[in-house]
Structure formats: structure tokens, C-alpha cells
Amino acid sequence: MSENVVVIGGGPAGIEASRRLRDLGYIPILVEKAPALGGHLARWDRLFPDGIEAGKILDPMLQDLDGIKYFTDTEISSINRLKDTWVVKLSNGLSAQVRAILLTTGFDLFKAEKKEEYGYGIYERVITNADLEDWFKSGAAPQ
């Protein structure tokens, strides 16, 4: 097939989509704005509901990137239609003509301080699950 496909977002969904596209004969170009691939999963220690280590899911994915062009610390500068393809320009100065664009941009965590009634940001012992995961992952005890 040898057609380029841009995958925007380098979390687990973007990585897996890129791997599947590669296996189908496409040339995936994976673009992630963060300094590393993995998204939120890279920050977490354990996964609900079984408590499996996040690294046991993510690490094998990251070790299977052969044939995938990927860029970190990179954003999409522009996307323009050109007949039956797209021209995608990246913030690193590169551009690619692609057959398709796949959005796998993930999610942002809820800003808990917006709900004052929960006490987050007011009482030091009120934390979010994301805070707890950071502590578990780092091995550091909360202050």
C-alpha cells in the first residue's frame, strides 16, 4: 500500500493505531506534542480494575515501533487539502502528503479545583486519583 497516514496523538490509542496501520501496509507518521510517547498511561502506576502495572501495557507497545515514523515535542502547524490527499505541516519544519489523518488526542483530566465543595486545593490532604498515581509511580510519600 505504502501510503502515509498521520496519527495525531501519541498515547496508547495513537501508538496502537500506528502499529495496526503499519501491519496493514501503511506508513504511519505519529505526532505527539509531549516530550515522550505514552500519554497519561506513562504517568500512571496501576490500571483499574485489575491493578495491572501500567508499564506492562505501555512498554511492549513502545518496543514495537519499527516502521513507524514518530515525532515528539511536535505539533501540527497546518493541514491543507490537496485533491484526494492532505498536506500536513509539523512544527518541526517537516511536512508530509498523506492519504488520511487519524485523531487520537486523548483527554484532559478534570480540574478538581473547579469544584471547591470537594476541598481540592483548599485542604492539603484532599487529592485526586491522578495525584495519587503520581505518588505511587514516583515511590515518594505525600508531603
Feature names for model-found ranges:
Residues 1-143:
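Residues forming the flavin
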